[in-house]
Regions:
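Glycine-rich N-terminal segment of FAD-binding domains in flavoprotein oxidoreductases
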Residues: 1, 5
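FAD-binding subdomain of flavoenzyme oxidoreductases
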Residues: 7, 11-153
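C-terminal substrate-recognition/cap domain of FAD-linked oxidoreductases
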Residues: 137-266
Length: 266
């Protein structure tokens, strides 16, 4: 379950292509329509499905890099033996990120902002497209309570998408008219909202979803929280459909102040 992309390919272009193969991307929250997929994974933008993020470098797999000297270098499984096309002929998929040797050379490239070399293509791991998705939200005035629940959800691997937004960001994402919609939405929301999705796949999807929902209900009750199908006027289904695509224009992070600066605590 891997795809290979060149710089400049956007999430809007790649999402339907992998969907045709029954796959999906582990993508960041509402990237810009013009955002390069390769640029996103090289910058280590936080993804929405921590269940599948085994390492800080995920979902990046392999890369082809040209250094300032003009030397070509391939990281991970793509390093060889043979060219990439020769690897394809024998079933090589450029999925493992480590190597060549025992070193993790891809870590030199990620976060370097082009100072170490120019990436000409990258492969990234994809996930299976679920057959059933049941989204939920949990609102709270306490971030600590939601963090406790999130920790258990991820630890027990029961959810796919899983993230927390404050009222300002959630309102900014769904406000259609500024500033009227933004103020109205923000006032109707709790200070913090946890969103998560329970998914079922090929084998016994309904039973899987029902079982996870029951277990999560036990968790929320133990923590004094309650899962719901909507946060204020925003339904969980609407959130799910929105976050599985790139941001509409104008870019949601620019709506409030006209500019933004992302700071990732990795």
């Amino acid at each position: 379950r891997v795809c290979m992309v060149e710089p400049g390919v956007t999430f809007g272009e790649l999402i339907p292509r992998v969907r045709k193969e029954g796959l999906r991307l582990n993508m960041p929250l509402l990237p810009r329509k013009t955002k390069s997929v390769v640029g996103s994974v090289l910058e280590r933008e936080p993804v929405l499905m921590p269940k599948y993020q085994w390492d800080i470098s995920d979902p990046l797999a392999c890369t082809e890099v040209f250094f300032g000297t003009g030397d070509e270098f391939r990281t991970g499984q793509s390093a060889g033996p043979g060219t990439v096309k020769e690897q394809w002929k024998v079933g090589g998929l450029q999925k493992a990120p480590y190597g060549p040797g025992i070193a993790s050379w891809h870590r030199l490239i990620q976060g370097a902002q082009g100072t170490m070399g120019i990436v000409t293509w990258a492969s990234m791991r994809c996930e299976i497209l679920p057959g059933i998705e049941e989204p939920f939200v949990v609102e709270s005035g306490s971030l600590g309570a939601l963090l406790d629940l999130t920790s258990w959800l991820i630890r027990l691997r029961m959810v796919n998408e899983c993230f927390i937004l404050n009222d300002a960001d959630l309102a900014a994402i769904f406000a259609k008219k500024w500033p009227e919609d933004y103020g109205r939405l923000k006032d109707s929301l709790a200070p913090w909202t946890l969103f998560y999705t329970v998914a079922g796949y090929e084998f016994r999807p309904e039973e899987r979803v029902e079982s996870h929902i029951k277990d999560i209900t036990d968790l929320t009750q133990r923590l004094g929280l309650e899962a719901a199908r909507a946060a204020g006027p925003i339904s969980a289904n609407e959130i799910l459909k929105t976050v599985q695509q790139p941001s509409r224009e104008p870019y949601w992070k620019l709506s409030a102040k006209g500019a933004c600066q992302d700071v990732f605590f990795l």
